[in-house]
Swiss-Prot record:
It is found in: Cytoplasm. The lineage of its organism: Bacteria, Pseudomonadati, Pseudomonadota, Gammaproteobacteria, Enterobacterales. Its main location: cytoplasm. Coiled coil: none annotated. This is Protein FdhE.
Length: 309
């Protein structure tokens, strides 16, 4: 991997002197992630053919905000950071890190928060999850992390992922130390947890003009240079697609080398764009990319593939 997190006690003067350079990682700022996402989803739901589903996703994002403050996480990750650094692995690697029962507590709290807002099939889904055993929930979590989407129904997956994401984001926000970029690439996966991005964003503010990929699990953002495929790192056959015009705030970056695409959002075109919400609200663009023969290189946390997809 090309971005490592250095334990705090190993930071030397060389790391401290690079403070004015491009930040390789932006850890999640949980104070505004979920509220902002919920607000953006509700805003995008207006005059959108997917309006009902966007409002449904907004309910989940709002519930995540409530549960975040009802169930804070206290955890010392110092030893974990050091061990992962020695191994050259992401510190919160989804394929290695043991899960404790905190994530299931978050899931049941999310269900309790959402139940009064749900009806019909959605209510039946969360009631089914409410009755599931700890072992069944762990099996579903492991299947999602292994990209075994056929083993978890696409209507249950967003709720399971919402709890896992909240748990991983809480852990990511507690990481002590500092990220350091190293030679080499291999940045298609999150350097913190090893999950995939949901989309990428060209930012404004202190990171003006820089592109960051946004993790679909732990909410961390990591820097990847522009005009380079985020999946295979080639740059010779990239194209940009939109349903509006060249000034569109949401585009798809396609790569002819690997045949995939990832959404790229531009804050300078619309400061309100949000990595998850704007990706979900632009599924018409996904349909166009599929027609053009490109496969999506990311997963939106509110939209998982069903069996056979």
């Amino acid at each position: 991997m090309s971005i490592r997190i250095i334990p705090q006690d190993e930071l030397g003067s060389s790391e401290k002197r690079t403070a004015d350079m491009i930040p390789p990682l932006l850890f999640p700022r949980l104070k505004n992630v979920y509220n902002r996402r919920a607000e953006r989803l509700r805003e995008l739901a207006e005059n959108n053919p997917l309006g009902d589903y966007l409002r449904f996703a907004a309910l989940i994002a709002h519930a995540q905000e409530v549960v975040l403050y009802d169930h804070p996480l206290e955890m010392d990750l110092t030893a974990r950071i050091k061990e992962a650094n020695d191994q050259g692995k992401p510190p919160l690697d989804i394929h290695v890190l043991p899960r404790d029962k905190h994530w299931q507590k978050l899931l049941h709290s999310l269900i309790a928060e959402l139940k009064p807002e749900m009806n019909g099939p959605a209510l039946a889904v969360i009631e089914n999850l409410e009755k599931a055993s700890e072992q069944e929930l762990e099996q579903m979590a492991s299947a999602l992390f292994a990209s075994d989407f056929a083993s978890v129904s696409s209507d249950k997956a967003p709720f399971i992922w919402a709890a896992l994401s909240l748990y991983w984001a809480q852990m990511a926000s507690l990481i002590p130390g500092k990220a350091r970029a190293e030679y080499g690439e291999a940045r298609q996966y999150c350097p913190v947890c090893g999950s995939m991005p949901v989309s990428s964003m060209v930012q404004i503010g202190t990171t003006q003009g820089l592109r960051y990929l946004h993790c679909n699990l732990c909410e961390t953002e990591w820097h990847v240079v522009r005009v380079k495929c985020s999946n295979c790192e080639q740059s010779r056959d990239l194209h940009y697609w939109s349903l509006e015009n060249e000034q569109a705030a949401v585009k798809a970056e396609s790569c002819g080398d690997c045949g995939t695409y990832l959404k790229i959002l531009y804050q300078e075109k619309d400061p309100k764009v949000e990595a998850v919400a704007d990706d979900l609200a632009s599924l018409v663009l996904d349909a166009r990319m599929e027609q053009e023969g490109f496969a999506r290189s990311s997963i939106n946390p509110f939209l998982f593939p069903g069996e056979g997809e």
